[in-house]
Amino acid sequence: MIDLASAAVCRERLSDPKASVPIDDMQARPSLPITSPEAVAGAERAQRLLPMAKNLVEVSLRRLSADYKLNNRSGFNARVQRAIARVRAVKVIRPDMDSRDNASVFLKNPQTIVFGTIFLAGLPSDEGVVSVLAHELVHIGDGGEDNLSQLFLAVGIRASRLTSLKIHGQPAEELTCDLVGTLTARLYVSATPSYEPLPRRISRSLAHNCVEQDEGDDDHLSPKITIRALLTLNPTLSRELVYGR
C-alpha cells in the first residue's frame, strides 16, 4: 500500500496544474526578487491561509496528542496549551529572497514565518502552502521551552518501529512537523470541498518531496523517505491516495 500511495503522490504531481515544484528543482533555480509576481502571489496566498492554518494546526495537535496517548502524561496538556498559544500569536508572513527554497522561524520573532521567495513561487496550491505553514507553526509552538518534545519523541518511536529506521532527535521533530502538515492539509481539504479529485488535493501536501536527487542530512530524512514515513504513519491517507476515497 505504501508503495502505491507514494507513487500516486508523484504521479499526481505530473498532471496537476497546481503541482508543487520538487525541492531539488527549487534549489537549482536562480534567486527570485520579493517583487516578482510569483513571489507576491505566493506571499499573499500564505498570508490569506495563515488564520485557517493556525486553527487546523490546533485541531491536528490535539488529535495527535490523543492518538499517541499523551494527554494523561503529567504536564503535557499544559505544554500543548502553551504551544497552541504561541501558534495563535503568529501574524506575519515575511518573504525573503535570501531564504530561497526554505521557510523558517526565529524564536526571537515568534510572530513571523519567513518564506523564501523560491519556495513561495514553488507552492502554487493552497494545500501545499497550508502544509508548510503547519510545519513552521509546530516549530513555533515548540518554542524554546520544548513544549512538544514528548510528541516528537512519540512520533519518532512509532516511525522507527514501523519503518525500521532510527528516527530520533531533530529528524523526529522535523518528521512530526511534516506529519502535522499533512494532517492539517487533509483537514483543509475537508473544509474546502471542490470538484478536484481527492488524491490530487491530498498529494499537494507531499509533492514537493518528489525529487530526483533524494538526499537527507543530519536534521532531515531524505524527501522520498519522508513521504514513505508519513504515509506509514497515516494509513488512512495512503488508502485515500490509492483508492480516491
Go through each PLM region and give its residues:
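A Zn2+-metalloprotease active-site environment signal
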Residues: 2-231, 235-244
